[in-house]
Amino acid sequence: MQPLAERLRPKTLDDYIGQKHLVGPGAILRKMIDAGRISSFILWGPPGVGKTTLAQIIANKLETPFYTLSAVTSGVKDDARSIFSKGRPILFIDEIHRFSKSQQDSLLGAVENGTVTLIGATTENPSFEVIRPLLSRCQLYVLKSLEKEDLLELLQRAITTDTILKERKIELKETTAMLRFSGGDARKLLNILELVVESDTEETVVITDDMVTERLQQNPLAYDKDGEMHYDIISAFIKSIRGSDPDGAIYWLARMVEGGE
C-alpha cells in the first residue's frame, strides 16, 4: 500500500496546494502551462512544498514524456543521452545541487537547443550550487514554505478524500503539534497524520496535541544522517529556530542527536 503522501499527491493544478504566486490564476507559471509552452526552469524551495509534484503535473498537463534522473543512482551522461532521443521530453532532476559540475555540463547542449526541457529542483541556493552556464539557460522560480492555511487544507483533504482515512472517524481537535512537528513540510505532515491514525484503535480517532507528541516520542520518524532525511530535519530545525518555536527546535535537535548527529 502506498504511503498517504503518495496517495494524496495532486494530479492537476486545481488540486495543488500552495504556491499561488506561481500557479494561481493569472500567475506567470500558470499562464505558461495553460498555453502549453514552457522553457527550462529550476524550482528552488524547502522540502515538502511541492517541487516534484508540480513537475509531474506539468508533464501530465502537456502530455509530454517525463523522465527523472538521480545524481546518486544515474550514470548521467549515458542516461541523459538515451533520454535526449525520446522526442523533446521533460527531464526532471531532483536535488540538482547534488550533480557535479561535469554532470551539469553534460546537460547544456540539450537544454540550449531545446532537445529537452529541464526542470530542476533544489533546496539549496542555485546561485551557489548550479553552474552559471546552466543557470543562465533556465528560469528560476522560488517556492515558498506552505502557510498554516495550506497545511490545514491538506489535513482536511486527507481525512475526507483519502480512500483509507475517510473510512475512519477522525476528529482534528487540535492541530498545533502536527503543524509544528511537520516544519511546514507537507509530506512530513501527512506522514505524522498517518502514523497517529494507524496507531489508534478507537472507533473515533480524536487527534490532540498531547496525543501527537506522545505518538512521535514512541515512534520517532526515520533519520539517516547520511541520507535525505538528514537535510529535511535540519531544515525543520532551522525553521523552528527562525519561528521562535523552542519546543519544535528541541524536538528536531533531539531527532538529530538520536540519529547519531
Label every model-predicted segment:
Residues 22-26, 64-91, 101:
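Short glycine-rich substrate-engagement loop in P-loop NTPases that contacts/grips substrate
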Residues 102-136:
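Conserved catalytic/switch belt of AAA+ P-loop NTPases
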Residues 1-46, 249:
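Pre-Walker A (pre-P-loop) alpha-helix and adjacent loop at the N terminus of AAA/AAA+ ATPase modules
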Residues 137, 150-166, 195-199:
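Conserved AAA+ ATPase "sensor/coupling" helix adjacent to the nucleotide-binding pocket
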Residues 176-181, 187-201, 211-217, 235-239, ...:
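C-terminal helical "lid" of AAA+/P-loop NTPase domains
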Residues 70, 139-152:
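Conserved AAA+ ATPase "SRH/arginine-finger" region at the nucleotide-binding site
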Residues 64, 131-145:
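A short helix-turn-beta junction within AAA+ P-loop NTPase domains corresponding to the substrate/partner-engaging
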Residues 1-2, 31-70, 84, 108-109, ...:
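Walker A/P-loop
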